[in-house]
Amino acid sequence: MSSLELSADVSTIRANRAGVYLAVLQLVFTLGWTTYVIYLPKLAAEVGIAPSAVILILMLDQAIFTITDTAMGIAADKIAPFVGRLGLFVGALTALSCAAFVALPFVAGTGPVAQAWFIALIVIWAITSSALRAPPLTLLGKHRAKPSVPFLSALAMLGYGLAGAVSPYLGVVLRDQDARLPFVISSVVLLVTALALSRVERGLVQDASSPEKPAEPAKPLGGVPMIFIVSMVILALGYQLHFSINSAPFYLRFAKPADLQWLMPVFWIGFNIAMFPASVVTKRRGGLIVMGAAGLLGALAVLGAELAGNLNTLIVAQFLAGAAWGCMLMSAISAALAIGDSGAEGKVVGLVFSALALATFARMAAVAGGLQKLPEYAPLLHWAPVACWSVAGAGLLVIAASRLQQSVARARGVSSS
């Protein structure tokens, strides 16, 4: 084996390790969020916050994420050219985030007098935790060859999917446990994981195919990127309405409430399995095409879930819907890194996460308003996911086709000249 081949193999191994690291980071962070959601009603009650206000706190979190995810992505673009700085930036903010997170159950235990401190800690935690979403993924776009990005994006999103799959079981296990120990354990594990980012960053920079050069100012986003982000909001809204509002009632047509903890993860099994073969298509055809096709196929799967006449059919439809969402999210990260290739990788990836947070906020607002309980809005909530995924999917395919035609026209112009 030549030294060039050996170097390529080492680079691939390091890249795959970076992808696995990002998967673990997303897994630990998402499980921490799940732990927070499980215990928030109890902790809020200890400081005198009414149960009806808990949803408002969760909406506040998502509103903060909508702003700070993009802000952290922009900050990552400015810091990433200085090797090692991004890891230090993420590590420092994670330490502050974990400190605020650990303090929540202890402050809540002091009673209603600590209500203001409790809210302040939640705000600090929400702001600083945004450092764990877009900034680490920015490294893939800045320091890896483009063909490897879809597979590494699939690896990174695997952590998100695994967390979604185990969340129902985590809720059952932690339901009657004291909050302090889970908060401490999840924070320690998250901090240790985040502190390893500097090492991962240096490994990716070392294997970068091109020598380091001064960072150029990021170019302003044009029309296609903005349409991409709007489409991401619509796709994410379809996911939120289907999975968080409609899926459980779909299952309850054929199963008992106690069975939901076994049935809800079917969606995430499809999510985790489909991303990797879809990453091959994304590598060859681009993220926009995969997003659009997955949106249309996902709309058909949701339609199948809506019309399912038995549990087996519903399980298959939910598996396919999860597979479609996995393809959408993986290809969205890949497309965001490609769109931001001019130095705005963090900004565009941050906008993707902001879109996810905005869609979550909209779903929570619908729940807070009781729309799912109003008969006149039931058809809207049932069919909105189909509309969201089909409209956004078709729009993305049109954009992808237009860009392909422009590329072909430019290629012909160059060849003729």
Residue ranges and their predicted role:
Residues 50-61, 151-154, 252-270:
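Loop-to-transmembrane helix entry
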Residues 4-65, 226-231, 236-253:
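Helix-loop boundary and gating motifs at the non-cytosolic
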Residues 150-172, 353-364:
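Glycine-rich segments within core transmembrane alpha-helices of 12-TM secondary carriers
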Residues 343-374:
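A late C-terminal transmembrane helix in Major Facilitator Superfamily
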Residues 86-103, 289-303:
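Structural signature of the two symmetry-related core transmembrane helices
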Residues 131-144, 327-341:
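Intracellular juxtamembrane helix-capping segments at the cytosolic ends
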Residues 86, 172-189, 368-392:
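A membrane-interface helix-boundary motif in multi-pass transporters
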Residues 68-83, 274-287:
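Helix-to-loop junctions at the C-terminal end of transmembrane segments
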